[in-house]
Amino acid sequence: MLSHIYKKEMIDALRDRKTILLTILVPMIMMLGLVFFYESMLSDKGEQYTLAVGHSLPPALESKLNEIDEISVKTFAKPEEAVDEGKADAYLNVPKEFDSYVNSMTPFKVDVYGNSIDQGSSNAMQLVQSALDQYKNEIVQQRLTNKHIDQSVIQPFTIQQKEADEEKGTSAIMLSAILPMLILTSIVSGAMPIALDIMAGEKDRKSIEALLLTPVSRNKVLVGKWLAVSTFGVASGVFALVFLILSTVLFTENLKTAFQLGDHMWSVIGASALIIVLSALLISAMELFISIMSSSVKEAQSYMSLVVFLPVFPMFFIFSKAPNQFDLSYFLIPFLNLHALFKQLLFGMVDPATILSTSGTIAVLIAIFFLLARACFLKDKWVLPK
């Protein structure tokens, strides 16, 4: 009888176009948008910045700035106002006596004006600052050469910064932030329509009484409904993961480096599949419990909005942390553990202890919410329409 109930609920759900829309199309559109957004953040290609000046620059300095492909030097009558009005990204203020000051070794000041709050202006200021530093070093080196002084006198050592994981770097950080959020949000949105309809909807239609009058036990009815909701949650999560991987690998250049998992690939896939299934079972139990407690679909929808935000909040707590900084406590906090685990997996860190801790925490929550849903489902005051 359990299989018959499960099959009935699945058939009823698949007849609803809204279910298919929220299970497939909405996650697909959302993922495509976020993938291209984060890819554009990682890629600086095609970005052009306007550098305002008040007069012509010294030839050597102008040549140094022209070597930067992203910078276009433009003369304005009022360059500072041009930056304030958005006509230019930054303003370089150098004295007209630049060359004479350099030749006479007279110290002087160069101003780089911009708005660090604006990303374009901030990038332009950094590029100009870097070019000025290089040009300043060249002048110093030339002066030392003229005085027959070895450059090592003022440069005893050089500094070279290296990333711990240069191959993945920023792309893995970006994906580790959006991957768990997208998967969990897809599970929530995929399971929600059927969870709303399967209990609160039947109360609105007053069809729940007929189901309860059948000889099937309420426990089997509840399990059948829960498995049906979970199936849509799992399908949404798997589809979200597969589509995210495909869209990232096929349509991006920077983000796809995060999926270079090497020997850990199958371990990561297996752990991800386990977490998706457990997350779907948990979210489905939560949504089913809310649907049973609610007297109508409208009331259930207001409560469900709280569930939608659960996958998002943890991202802000771990975004700035490296995956090797998580202690065991991170994997015992619901939903935060999912974000932490996916971040470790994307960096190729497959730790059985963290996987078991996360799975165990989710399993305990599944049992709690299912038992709460069962306790309410066995009482007529929660099941029968008011």
Curated annotation (Swiss-Prot):
Induction: Induced by ethanol and the protonophore carbonylcyanide p-chlorophenylhydrazone (CCCP) and, more modestly, by sodium and potassium. Positively regulated by the two-component regulatory system NatK/NatR. Keywords: Cell membrane, Ion transport, Membrane, Sodium, Sodium transport, Translocase, Transmembrane, Transmembrane helix, Transport. One of its GO terms (molecular function) is ABC-type sodium transporter activity. It is a multi-pass membrane protein. Its EC number is 7.2.2.4. It catalyses: Na(+)(in) + ATP + H2O = Na(+)(out) + ADP + phosphate + H(+). One of its GO terms (cellular component) is plasma membrane. It is an enzyme of class 7 (translocase). PANTHER family: ABC TRANSPORTER PERMEASE, ABC TRANSPORTER PERMEASE PROTEIN NATB. The complex is composed of NatA and NatB. Part of an ABC transporter that catalyzes ATP-dependent electrogenic sodium extrusion. This is ABC transporter permease protein NatB. It comes from Bacillus subtilis (strain 168).
